[in-house]
């Protein structure tokens, strides 16, 4: 698609592409902080309810939101997540609930670049090439919208 072709203007740094967890979440965040404009962790959870896509938002807890680097970056994290969900919704992807679920994650606790963990489905979700293309198109649209392109 045209949205997907534009993504090649940005470089994607794949930190992990399987279940091998040689690098922990802090190490992945450090890599992203030093080498990326944003950090997007793509996940398919282990449930079988086919509930749809959503992002892990920063919890609305004052003690957490007042801790650095969260204090300086939580709004960027949530804005990136909302933009990705909007892009996915626009591509016709099923969205869970309001599109977000509050969760205290290591990734957002240590990130100084916009960083989000997004669940794209689960074991019951369709994993066909056409669905993966649809997810990719939605994510590209969300990234482009976030960066104002």
Language-model segment annotations:
Residues 2-149:
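Active-site-proximal helix/loop segments of hydrolytic enzymes
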